[in-house]
Curated annotation (Swiss-Prot):
Upper lineage: Eukaryota, Fungi, Dikarya, Ascomycota, Saccharomycotina
Pfam families with a match to the protein in the record: GTP_EFTU (PF00009), GTP_EFTU_D2 (PF03144), GTP_EFTU_D3 (PF03143)
Organism name: Saccharomyces cerevisiae (strain ATCC 204508 / S288c) (Baker's yeast)
G3: region residues: 117-120
Protein name: Elongation factor Tu, mitochondrial
Presequence extent in this chain: 1-38
Length: 437
């Protein structure tokens, strides 16, 4: 992998959120109660960490997530959720794949986890970007029967692009493999692949097991015991992140829904700062003028919060706001701290063909999609005025500075990173260096 890419893609604050176990339905049921006293207070006695399962379709990500909840449920650290409870959408069950990201809550002896189960199907890879963008670390699942596959590589690339630095490997379906040399080959390939994408492949924990055996209570050495080894590795290898608590509150909007008689709830992952009930907020993005509102309730995993803080996946009940006034990609922010913009100067790295990017160059007026926080917006790219030759081509593997015009106002800040996608694949990544308008 180009040495330039890791330099451009250093660790940043994680910038997006997903649904908490189809978050809208969970918080909807909670907020629809006549009073919020229904919800227990959220326990903050353990460090809170956001992790997730990534990897190729059908390699067992959702089965592993279910196996983790079953194993920890026996120890009082989770509520058991089977495969169907995690893949709740009818289309997901019918096709046997995860389409949107779903969140599960559990605890080990050391930590409280919010676990996002990311889709592996190529048609829904952009939803995986949202899931990956909120992880403090990740478990990449690879089937022993297949080894690394195309989405194994793409998920590692996406995880690297959004700032995930620590990866634990779970080699799944080992109950179907009789040849130990095949398992050794899969481990060797995964270590090489991690190194190729800028991770520490030499030292990353690799756990061999079978999520299905853990679910069905068979072969405990590769079932339940392997799941506990995996969780121990996650506890030890993925560091507890330092949260950005001292800056003004900001939470990107992931999902929106209405609660009859209560108001509108926005769900998302708090990017920075703190929020308390009764505080005033601005909703920024899409509109030229921010919307003003007041927070009337905060909950996480069906538990009431007095306040939300950076790293929390929360539902926020807003006063006087209709659902049709809000869109995914907006942000909730402390009044006066964030503005929406339509033109920026950005430093871009265009992925090479070998990195899964474009096979050919592009010129001025290129129109890809920009993924930034939870926003997905079309941009028109042009060379800065200082560039003499506006007819030149930007080639795969290039670093280049471009002016980007966004088709609608989007909350942006200098220093933010974003992904560029076109035709169902990631083609580049960028860093905002200047706000123009």
């Amino acid at each position: 992998m180009s040495a330039l890419l890791p330099r451009l893609l250093t660790r940043t604050a994680f910038k997006a959120s997903g649904k908490l176990l189809r978050l809208s339905s969970v918080i909807s049921r909670t907020f629809s109660q006549t009073t919020t006293s229904y919800a227990a207070a959220f326990d903050r006695s353990k460090p809170h960490v956001n992790i997730g399962t990534i990897g190729h379709v059908d390699h067992g990500k959702t089965t592993l997530t279910a196996a983790i909840t079953k194993t920890l449920a026996a120890k009082g650290g989770a509520n058991f959720l089977d495969y169907a409870a995690i893949d709740k959408a009818p289309e997901e069950r019918a096709r046997g794949i995860t389409i949107s990201t779903a969140h599960v809550e559990y605890e080990t002896a050391k930590r409280h986890y919010s676990h996002v189960d990311c889709p592996g199907h190529a048609d829904y890879i952009k939803n995986m970007i949202t899931g990956a963008a909120q992880m403090d670390g990740a478990i990449i699942v690879v089937a022993a029967t297949d080894g690394q596959m195309p989405q194994t590589r793409e998920h590692l690339l996406l995880a690297r692009q959004v700032g995930v630095q620590h990866i634990v490997v779970f080699v799944n379906k080992v109950d179907t493999i009789d040849d130990p040399e095949m398992l050794e080959l899969v481990e060797m390939e995964m270590r090489e692949l991690l190194n190729e994408y800028g991770f520490d492949g030499d030292n990353a924990p690799i756990i061999m097991g079978s999520a299905l055996c853990a679910l069905e209570g068979r072969q405990p050495e590769i079932g339940e015991q392997a799941i506990m080894k995996l969780l121990d590795a996650v506890d030890e290898y993925i560091p507890t992140p330092e949260r950005d608590l001292n800056k003004p509150f900001l939470m990107p909007v992931e999902d929106i829904f209405s609660i009859s008689g209560r108001g509108t709830v926005v769900t998302g992952r708090v990017e920075r700062g703190n929020l308390k009930k009764g505080e005033e907020l601005e909703i920024v993005g899409h509109n030229s003028t921010p919307l003003k509102t007041t927070v009337t309730g905060i909950e996480m995993f069906r538990k009431e919060l007095d306040s939300a803080m950076a790293g929390d996946n929360a539902g926020v009940l807003l006063r006087g706001i209709r659902r049709d006034q809000l869109k995914r990609g907006m942000v909730l922010a402390k009044p006066g701290t964030v503005k929406a913009h339509t033109k920026i100067l950005a430093s871009l790295y265009i992925l090479s063909k070998e990195e899964g990017g474009r096979h050919s160059g592009f010129g001025e007026n290129y129109r890809p999609q920009m993924f930034i926080r939870t926003a997905d917006v079309t941009v028109v790219m042009r060379f800065p005025k200082e560039v003499e030759d506006h007819s030149m081509q930007v080639m795969p593997g290039d670093n280049v500075e471009m002016e980007c015009d966004l088709i609608h106002p989007t909350p942006l800040e200098v220093g933010q990173r974003f992904n560029i996608r076109e035709g169902g694949r990631t083609v580049g990544t960028g860093l905002i260096t200047r706000i123009i308008e």
